[in-house]
Amino acid sequence: MPKQKTHRGAAKRFKKTGSGKLKRDHAYTSHLFANKSTKAKRKLRKAGLVSAGDYKRIRQMLDNLK
């Protein structure tokens, strides 16, 4: 049986926190900033956490990630 490989696209987008949660960046941060309020842009700068519904699926893609 071959080894399970880490999904390289997911590995570039998610990082594990010290407590084992998954950290992610927000979407909507590449362009069209004139249409966004200052408050919205400020909130997008902070990292978010993966939601509970997505956690299991993403964790399987990152199985071998330290």
From Swiss-Prot:
UniProt region (Disordered), positions on chain: 1-26
Residue ranges, compositional bias (Basic residues): 1-24
GO annotations of cellular component type: cytosolic large ribosomal subunit
InterPro entries on file: Ribosomal_bL35, Ribosomal_bL35-like, Ribosomal_bL35_CS, Ribosomal_bL35_sf
GO molecular function: structural constituent of ribosome
GO biological process: translation
Pfam families xrefs: Ribosomal_L35p (PF01632)
Listed Gene3D superfamilies: 4.10.410.60
Record key words, sorted: Ribonucleoprotein, Ribosomal protein
Record has ATP-binding as a keyword: no
Name of the protein in its database record: Large ribosomal subunit protein bL35
Source lineage: Bacteria, Bacillati, Bacillota, Bacilli, Bacillales
Gene encoding the protein: rpmI
